């Protein structure tokens, strides 16, 4: 029997909805569990993973995930794999656009090495002049952006060609219209949409878990549970590469020192009067402070390589010797003898 390969469409508790690449026996999707072997090896199954399914129960439409195929990339929070592009949504008003959170989301997306699309929503709440100002601003940063209004039906259909045949992840702060956009793009009626809080001027987030929704033009789109403070790159040396403005300057010139931090070093070609440079310096100092305070911790391996009779290597879970190793006969006798002595002592 050939292997069944499918795409993990949703994860809830310990169950995974897997859409089969090729439907079989009239079944397109299986509700699966993760094999214990994968759990012992510490391999987490993410939405967006391509997996091998074993032991299908066609009448019950169930199965077990036996293997996770190699990933091209992975978004850590929330966990979603094999992303083709990031759709970053920000509101022009209610809540108003802010350079700081926009930049932090962009830095997170840059770390994935995938295409980035920037979308501004609620265009009906600001003037055309302000809409154009943000378009020009993003262009100076190195990004193209779309401006739309879901309530007025402005320009959202123009997004469809950019989503075809791709796995697209929709990210952004709460209350900017992520769930509303997905509801416009997909036929699903069970996507919850919430209003912005009148007191906090922030969104009441309605997405509870990560899920891929199919698009009519092919491809998948995922809403993500909101996170208001996306993470900066873990290594300060990676920060500069996440700014298109810095990449553009380094492509035209070079700094005097190869290890230039683009801060106070002489002969730096990056330092200058561009809008987000103060943000770069602020984030650089934050990361350097964190890096100097945290000692490097070596990760304990969870798997070991073992060769079979054909000489092919396969991975097996590396079990805790103290927990799983069987006692030798000598150890068993050593354990039994003191017990026997205690019995003899009690008889006397």
UniProtKB/Swiss-Prot annotation:
It is an enzyme of class 3 (hydrolase). Its cofactor is Zn(2+). Residues 323-333 have a biased composition (Basic residues). This is Small ribosomal subunit biogenesis GTPase RsgA. It is found in: Cytoplasm. GO terms for cellular component: cytoplasm. Keywords: Cytoplasm, GTP-binding, Hydrolase, Metal-binding, Nucleotide-binding, Ribosome biogenesis, RNA-binding, rRNA-binding, Zinc. Pfam families: RsgA_GTPase. The lineage of its organism: Bacteria, Bacillati, Cyanobacteriota, Cyanophyceae, Acaryochloridales.
């Amino acid at each position: 029997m050939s292997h069944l390969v499918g795409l993990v469409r949703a994860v809830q508790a310990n169950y995974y909805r897997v859409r089969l690449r090729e439907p079989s026996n009239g079944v397109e999707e299986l509700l699966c569990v993760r094999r214990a072997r994968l759990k012992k090896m510490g391999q987490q199954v993410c939405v967006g993973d391509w997996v091998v399914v074993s032991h299908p129960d066609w009448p019950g439409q169930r199965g077990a995930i036996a293997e996770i195929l190699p990933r091209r990339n992975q978004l850590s929070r929330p966990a979603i794999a094999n992303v083709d592009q990031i759709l970053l949504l920000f509101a022009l008003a209610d809540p108003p656009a802010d350079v700081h959170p926009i930049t932090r989301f962009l830095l997170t997306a840059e770390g994935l090495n995938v295409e980035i699309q920037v979308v501004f929503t609620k265009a009906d709440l600001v003037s055309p002049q302000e809409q154009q100002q943000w378009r020009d601003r993003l262009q100076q940063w190195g990004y193209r952006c779309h401006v739309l209004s879901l309530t007025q039906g402005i320009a959202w259909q123009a997004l469809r060609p950019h989503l075809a045949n791709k796995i697209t992840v929709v990210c952004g702060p709460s209350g900017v219209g992520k769930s509303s956009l997905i509801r416009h793009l997909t036929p699903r009626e069970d996507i919850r949409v919430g209003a912005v809080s009148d007191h906090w001027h922030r969104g009441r987030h309605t997405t509870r878990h990560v899920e891929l929704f199919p698009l009519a033009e092919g491809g998948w789109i995922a809403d993500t549970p909101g996170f208001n403070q996306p993470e900066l790159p873990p290594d300060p040396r990676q920060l500069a590469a996440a700014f298109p403005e810095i990449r553009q300057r380094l492509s035209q010139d070079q700094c005097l020192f190869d290890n230039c931090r683009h801060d106070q070093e002489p002969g730096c070609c990056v330092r200058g009067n561009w809008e987000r440079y103060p943000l770069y310096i602020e984030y650089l100092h934050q990361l350097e402070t964190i890096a100097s305070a945290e000692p490097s911790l070596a990760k304990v391996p969870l798997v070991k390589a073992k060769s079979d009779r054909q000489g092919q290597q396969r991975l097996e879970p590396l079990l805790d010797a103290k927990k799983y190793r069987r006692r030798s006969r000598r150890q068993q006798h050593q354990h039994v003898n003191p017990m026997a002595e205690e019995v003899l002592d009690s008889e006397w």
